[in-house]
Amino acid sequence: MDYADTWQAMIDHTQQRTRETPDEIWLLQHPPIYTQGIAGKAEHLLAPGNIPVIRTDRGGQITYHGPGQLIAYLLLDLRRRQLGVRELVRKMENTVINLLQSYLICAQSRIDAPGVYVKDAKIASLGLRVRRGACYHGIALNVAMDLSPFDAINPCGFPGLRITQTSELGIAASIDILEKKLVENFLVQLNSMQTNKEESLS
């Protein structure tokens, strides 16, 4: 699905939200494209070749999207959920960590660089934008894709950062299966948060 069209659809959805608008998760894949976050610096784009580059409004630096990468866009009313951005980022990271743990893969987050890593290789990127108390953008999990375009950038602004994907880690599950598991794990994270808030008020 075209990145620019999807991005505009997320903006429109967020601008048109009301207090009653349900939260949504959009699952898709993009054609090859580099996206520069609002903190992106030109020096991290080394040799893009014929792959288009678009400057977007999410946080962070430059990354690559392409076929075989699971994209989960989170369109959430943070104000209604009483959820802060830092807490949401932690929930997003834990979603991927727990998903990989179900396949006996040990992954972790990093304080200095949001995302999820297996040893020293990044397997999932995160990006968010908040407007009117609601967020969009989300999680990009590398599943079974051509990783060579990452060689043409400093991924997320880190020169030499290694990139990996589930297919390289012995996970044979298809992207369709991983989509379902990702959503299930994310909903567990959100529901756990809501339960804890309710208990603290009782």
Language-model-derived ranges and their functions:
Residues R129-R131:
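Short beta-strand micro-motifs enriched in acidic
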Residues S125-G127:
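Beta-strand scaffold of nucleotide-dependent catalytic cores
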Residues A134-N142:
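Conserved phosphate/anionic-ligand binding catalytic regions in large, soluble enzymes, centered on
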Residues M1-V118, K122-I123, S148, A172, ...:
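N-terminal lobe of the biotin/lipoate ligase/transferase fold
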Residues Y136, L147-S202:
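C-terminal accessory segment of soluble enzyme catalytic cores
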